[in-house]
Swiss-Prot record:
Superkingdom of origin: Bacteria
Disulfide bridge map: none
Species per Swiss-Prot/TrEMBL record: Streptococcus equi subsp. equi (strain 4047)
Record protein name field: UPF0246 protein SEQ_2141
Any one annotated GO CC term: cytosol
UniProt record, GO biological process: response to hydroperoxide
Taxonomic lineage of the native organism: Bacteria, Bacillati, Bacillota, Bacilli, Lactobacillales
Family (UniProt): Belongs to the UPF0246 family.
Pfam family, one: H2O2_YaaD
Amino acid sequence: MLTFLIPTAKEMKPVPPCYPHQLPQKSLPILEAMAELSLEELARAYSIRIEAASKEAKRLKAIAQGQSSAYPAYQLFNGLMYRHLKRDNLSKDQQDYLSKQVYITSSFYGIIPTDEKIAEHRHDFHTKVTINGQSLKHYWRPIYDQFAKDHKQIISLLSNEFRDVFSKEYQKLWISPKFMEERSGQLKTHSTISKKARGAFLTACLENNVQTKEALKQLSFAGFCYNEELSTETNYYYIKKES
């Protein structure tokens, strides 16, 4: 069975219904460390303005007091990749695929199923906070590595920020899809292309119930097709040809 890893997104959009929120035990030290920061320190930790930090402080306080609403993570996150992922009108098989084979890597919650109920928050691995003297990456690494050890065939749709939390010995075993567009005879890639394509790729996987590496190579989605010539054992290239 294939296991897919995807990143979180800064942009969030709550979609009813909401649920009671319960913070995982491993996330509590992070919440406590963030709660100790002054508003100015919080702004520096997030690299945001004081006004935005004030909003985040209220969110953190609500989480700490058990007053936050929670939403399925794949519905709450609303970045470019998530907007290009099929999230509504899923068949039971597609919903099962999304909830049992796709996991979200979070700097606040750890590695969670896509349907895990989470609260609105702002957090990534660039957040400047230490937990018992450790960076966020080092704090989560043992748990991330254990996940990689327990899941033998990982398909990584992670950016460097999230991938680097894992030890390199696990990273080198993954398959990492790469997405490029042909423009004026040249192959181009940038974050917008990659984010949109990740969502379309994952949609194709759940719609086709992809379970093998060979099936990944047969996928066609949003104009992208697998390119045998560029691909390696661990990097699968998908190219969108000029029309």
